[in-house]
Every structure is written in C-alpha cells, then in structure tokens.
Amino acid sequence: NMERFRSRGKMDKLVYIIDLDGTVWEDTPNEIAHTHTKDAKLFDNAIEWINKKYDEGNYICLFTARTEALKKITEDKLNTIGLKYHQLMLNKPRLRHTEFKGYHYIDNCAVLKSSRFEGVWSDLVEKDLKITVFKDD
C-alpha cells in the first residue's frame, strides 16, 4: 500500500493515524462493541474531516484497540458511514484497564505530529508546546 502511495508523488502529504472509539464515534469498548458499534454516535464532522484529508491525497490509517474478532463489525460500520481510509490496523495496546497513562510514539520520520482529540473535529492549528526528544550526545 505505501509503495503504491509513494509512487504517485505523494511525498508532500501526511499519514494520518486515527483511532476509532472515542475519536470517530462514541467510545464502545471491546466488551460491548458487538452490540453497540452499529448504533455508536458519530462525532460531528469526523467523517467530513477525515474524508477531506483522504481526498487531498493524504494516507488514512485507522489504528484501533479493537481485536480481530471485531474486524467485520468495524468494517461494516466504516462502510455504512462512508469513511474513506487506506488501512485498518487492529490490536493497538489497550490503556483502559491498565496503569499506563498514554502512548509514546517513536519513529525515525523527520516530520512527526500528534493531536489529542478532545471531542471536536475542526481545523488543525499549530501551537508551541514542550516535547520530549532523545538527548543529543
């Protein structure tokens, strides 16, 4: 998928890695996802925002803590709501019932951005924030 994407001259675009539960639609934990996914309420503008990024040529990767057992119901929901994406990745480590407070993503990519979703899909803006980086030797 990424090789085909690169060969189309998309190197100026971004890969958006987007969670589903609590981000695209209301939180439906794995324990209730079989019965609640179909009717899970979408966050306003989520579909429009993501589909716009897709249409602009960006790569959309959905990364969720849902398990392989929930793949079909998840894909059915995505098809029903018309969300455009390139890749669905399941089995993201779950934080819900652990002592961990968040994710820390490490990559060799020169451009790395992170946006905490707080319930509103709107334009992304730049802010000067303190970040954690590896110490230079």
Residues of each region from the PLM?
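HAD-like aspartate-dependent phosphatase fold
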Residues: 3-137
